[in-house]
A protein has these predicted regions:
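Hydrophobic/aromatic residues in alpha-helical transmembrane segments
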Residues: 49-56, 90, 94, 109, ...
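Transmembrane helix-loop-helix hairpins at lipid-water interfaces of multipass membrane proteins
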Residues: 33-86, 160-214, 305, 309-314
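Extended non-transmembrane interhelical loops and adjacent amphipathic helices
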Residues: 1-18, 99-145, 226-274, 345-358, ...
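Cytosolic ends of transmembrane helices, especially the final helix of ABC transmembrane type-1 domains
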Residues: 299, 318-357
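Hydrophobic alpha-helical interface/terminus motif in multipass membrane transporters
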Residues: 53-57, 113, 213, 217, ...
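Conserved A-loop
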Residues: 382-386
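Juxtamembrane/interface segments at transmembrane-helix termini
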Residues: 88-101, 206-226, 333-346
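Membrane-integrated ABC transporters
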Residues: 1-45, 64-72, 90-94, 126-162, ...
């Protein structure tokens, strides 16, 4: 793949990902259904435990009624057991249909090969395109494989955001008592809007930094696949008994040693990827993590200040902190996933370039119309008869 073909707009990237997801659904609908079911279930269930735990803590800090505490604890334990049971079933369903996913993807590509006109199949450009798709798939999973991972993450983060927001809205609408004096300013809509704006800005900034780090791997896709080819050949050359004589006569083990033991290899300590990790990629990822900690600090301070003034009880603190940090991680994950989808789009474009190769030759059967004004002549060549 040419490195100058890396720039794809977000709109086109989303269209390519959506088309790829529909392609999966056409071939493997139960795989998609099992994936979505487990994703939604895993996104919703944490909030059930958060809510029930908050009720237990609130009761322990309040009336301390033994009957109510016993009831809440029983409900929490039964809910946890039920969630675990259903999760195990959904995971088994998904694992069953996800087994051999690499072969499932290759089936989609191979069906196109079998359906292709021979002149296109025999074209070296077609086979180079197919080989490039397979290499990117076998390496970092670029192309169709990452589509499933990205949509799973996007679906999970989306439902998690919806549930989290429904539990955190009251955090910003709850009023601080007027006896709190200076902290009453937190009731001001302008102050609340400013705090939300800062949280949104931090939430957006963190995954954007992580996305910039991910772009370095896209730029290195050609080197990645080339290094995999070198390793696949020279790393196993010594085990090929058919080439053992050539290895000894021409001392080819020195060539293998050069490629297998060199620390300048892209995957080794002095290679390109190591330099990325020590340089720009490491910087962007560290900055992304630092920004996420800033958000956590702001969330804790805001929630604890409102609880300190008596806006809500200790149980609500647990609920709000858990929910708001969950919303933050989900929004960050959603933005990060969209960045990954845009990075993956260039490889999907390559895949669909292969799948969209037209079949110009006629496929099927042609009938010959028999007419009285036409004379047909049938000639047999190299025909034998057996009685």
């Amino acid at each position: 793949m040419k490195t100058n073909e890396k720039n794809i707009s977000l709109k086109e990237a989303l269209q390519l990902n959506h088309r790829a997801y529909k392609l999966f659904y056409r071939y493997y609908p139960k795989l998609i259904l099992s994936q979505i079911s487990l994703t939604i279930w895993k996104a919703l269930t944490p909030y059930i435990i958060i809510y029930l735990s908050a009720l237990v803590i609130e009761e322990l800090a309040g009336d301390r009624s033994p009957d109510r505490i016993r009831f809440l604890v029983t409900i929490t334990l039964l809910s946890g057991a039920g969630i675990s049971l259903i999760s195990a079933f959904l995971k088994k369903w998904k694992r069953t249909w996800s087994a051999g996913l690499g072969m499932k993807i290759k089936r989609i590509l191979c069906e196109k090969l079998f359906d292709m006109d021979y002149c296109d199949l025999d074209d070296s450009k077609t086979m180079e395109l197919y080989s490039s798709i397979i290499q990117n798939l076998n390496g970092p999973g670029w192309g169709l494989y990452n589509v499933l991972l990205n949509y799973e993450a996007l679906c999970s983060e989306g439902f998690s955001i919806i549930c989290g927001l429904s539990m955190t809205i009251s955090l910003f609408t709850s009023q601080i008592p007027k006896t709190a004096e200076k902290l009453v300013i937190l009731n001001n809509p302008v102050c609340v809007t400013a705090i939300i704006s800062v949280m949104v800005l931090i939430t957006w900034f963190s995954p954007v930094l992580a996305g910039k780090a991910g772009k370095y791997w896209v730029r290195s896709a050609d080197l990645h696949t080339f290094s995999n080819r070198l390793f696949a050949y020279y790393g196993r050359l010594g085990y090929d008994s058919k080439k053992a004589a050539d290895m000894r006569i021409y001392q080819q083990e020195k060539i293998c040693e050069k490629h297998n033991l060199s620390k300048e290899n892209p995957f080794c300590s002095k290679g390109l990827f190591a330099r990325y990790g020590k340089g720009p990629v490491g910087f962007y990822m560290a900055a992304s993590s630092a920004v996420s900690v800033i958000f956590t600090g702001i969330a804790y301070v805001f929630v604890c200040l409102k609880a300190w003034t008596g806006a809500f009880g200790i149980g609500a603190v647990t609920k709000y902190i858990s929910s708001i940090t969950k919303v933050y991680s989900s929004v960050s994950g959603c933005i990060s996933t969209i960045e990954d989808m845009q990075n993956n789009a260039v490889f999907l474009k390559q895949t669909f370039e292969f799948l969209d190769i037209p079949n110009n030759m006629y496929q099927g059967s042609l009938t010959t119309e028999k007419r009285s004004d036409r004379k047909y002549e049938i000639e047999f060549r190299n025909v034998s008869f057996r009685y």
